[in-house]
Amino acid sequence: MAAALRFDNIGKVFPGVRALDGISFDVQAGQVHGLMGENGAGKSTLLKILGGEYQPDSGGVLVDGQAMRFPSAAASIAAGVAVIHQELQYVPDLTVAENLLLGRLPSALGWVRKHTAQRFVRERLAAMGVDLDPQAKLRRLSIAQRQMVEICKALMRNARVIALDEPTSSLSHRETEVLFKLVDDLRRDGRALIYISHRMDEIYRLCDACTIFRDGRQVASHASLAQVPRETLVRQMVGREISDIYHYEPRALGDVRLSARALEGDALRSGASFDVRAGEIVGFFGLVGAGRSELMRVIYGADRRTGGALTLDGKPLDIRSTRDAIRHGIVLCPEDRKEEGIVAHASVAENINISCRRHALRAGLFLDLKREAETAERFIKLLKIKTPNRRQKIRFLSGGNQQKAILARWLAEPDLKVVILDEPTRGIDVGAKHEIYGVIYELAKRGCAIVMVSSELPEVLGVSDRIVVMREGRIAGELARGEANEEAVLNLALPQGAIAHAA
């Protein structure tokens, strides 16, 4: 019996880069096939070929034994294939129902039947266990909710082959469990699934088989994942041993650098108070919707501050815009890289230099292009950013390499004092995480105060000197590194009703 999906010797070349070289593996009906590899290994490129965005330069794709050619996304969808990319694709000013039914809205005499569409979508969402308002516009939803819309869109097309690229990267624990149930149901229903994730727990929880990519090549395939130790997968992914991914080292801390007192914003229910010392890494943990990102945006001047006070090195700080924050040496690496972090149409070099250009002016008028080029080359080498050259458009880089470029932007700032990192390793492989943690430690050694927001509890525990836990828009408590463990952090993060119910 033919495999539900077969990649046959797939090759793809971009200018200066061989993105894929001889990729061949099968995905069976009723199977979840994991795809792992470092950022830039070629996983997302393969899915773009499957989804009709790219054309292979060699090899081909077979669906149910039949050779297929996908000149467009529409051709891929028509063949029963659904690809859900890490970078979400939606229309922000349309509703949930309109996004889910885009191109097939029920109509009569040219008029769209909105009530019929909303009722249909509400029934389908309920059947999938997803709690979303069909009338809500995508722009007003969280990243996690938008992710669920994309997943539901693929499921509503009744696709036989479904590929998921980092689907849980922005989901809460509850939403992740809903997704896992959906994947299990689809497997039992005989669908063929490709599942890309950097989270080992997810791969072992969901996947029957697994293929490993490195530098565009297929380095290993495992028909039965249950028999493969985790250490083997990591070694095959990165080509080296990583015994301690966090490699935490204590360091001397200075005086209080950033202090927040009774800080309030439109999305913060009560005043938030905390301190961060020079050279200290303070991890912020909380469930989705706890208010962590909202608090960081208030500090950075991206959202309005409605109350409270900030001080920097003991002096009052009045930040009314992101420009004010950067001028005082406070920077933010945002959660949503695509929308708020990178300038997609600009080059890697331009993205690295965009903030510190004021330091590259000659006579206050002319850009020192040689200096900018040297700065970009230095950080590309230092952070091991995988790019053909500094002129490459940043949108063509993997998520991990885009994140490194954003970090390079702030490393290039000579007067850096506070670095806020919102989900700095979201959707990034284990090798790139290891390198990014090294950058965070280097910033701390320089005396920067580091505030790191993360939904990955092991990361918060592994990297932070101190942990602040938020719950329902408030700071619920804080823990020193020596007293912090998963149970203590979760007890602070979970709603009190949930804790009582669990007891």
Curated annotation (Swiss-Prot):
One of its GO terms (molecular function) is ATP hydrolysis activity. The keyword Phosphoprotein does not apply. GO terms for cellular component: plasma membrane. PROSITE patterns: ABC_TRANSPORTER_1 (PS00211), ABC_TRANSPORTER_2 (PS50893), ARAG (PS51268). Keywords: ATP-binding, Cell inner membrane, Cell membrane, Membrane, Nucleotide-binding, Repeat, Sugar transport, Translocase, Transport. SUPFAM superfamilies: P-loop containing nucleoside triphosphate hydrolases. It comes from the Bacteria. InterPro entries: AAA+_ATPase, ABC_carbohydrate_import_ATPase, ABC_transporter-like_ATP-bd, ABC_transporter-like_CS, P-loop_NTPase. It holds the Pfam family ABC_tran. Belongs to the ABC transporter superfamily. Arabinose importer (TC 3.A.1.2.2) family. The complex is composed of two ATP-binding proteins (AraG), two transmembrane proteins (AraH) and a solute-binding protein (AraF). PANTHER family: ARABINOSE IMPORT ATP-BINDING PROTEIN ARAG, CARBOHYDRATE TRANSPORT ATP-BINDING PROTEIN MG119-RELATED. NCBIfam families: PRK11288.1. Part of the ABC transporter complex AraFGH involved in arabinose import. Responsible for energy coupling to the transport system. This is Arabinose import ATP-binding protein AraG 1.
